[in-house]
């Protein structure tokens, strides 16, 4: 979602794939475990609640990351992300998330040989991968591991896996349980699948929860404030850039100030900063 197109979606219109609702549903441990076991084919032995929108910012001066749903047990760490709008740089995003997850573990005193198995799971409503002619590859699932190009039998064994599901290609999925889930993600219709119906009923129940409704409103008010700041910052930068370019091209200060709705003092300050 572009910050400039940000629009609050009413609680009663939320679906499982919407930001806020997705995290709320997967905060329930049994649902989260079943989703992981269905999509990753790995057993989960955690008992604690999954962490929702986990913040990882290892250094004060560095950009952190906010993970949708983060859970771990004795042997593995799993990050689950819902992607309900097109994502063109998903590969670099998984790379960044992986680095933050590892740094978070290392800074808590875990030696790197003891790093847990790591899974980054993306559930996408649209295909994130295209060929050179911009045609989607149209696979229902993409699984990435680090192997040797010269000999695929040689595994780097770094214990990291990235799994990316494309719900728009649900018809091509051979596993019926995954196909039913991807159909639900793509259409919001749970069909006859027990797990998808359970997700759908959980969404309905959460919508009636007053705490969720107030938290969702507060979250969106915060996001709206960020959007306005981004708009203001973007407009300010554009004005300053246009002022400098016009001045370089010989336009008088009076005309620049008038056309950009600036005082001469403000314009002088902009030009002084650029010199």
Label each residue range with its predicted role:
Residues 1-161, 171, 225:
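Accessory alpha/beta interaction modules
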Residues 2-12, 16, 20, 39, ...:
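Short, charged alpha-helical interaction segments and adjacent helix-coil junctions
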Residues 157-175, 180-187:
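Upstream accessory/linker segments immediately N-terminal to the RecA-like ATPase cores of bacterial MutS
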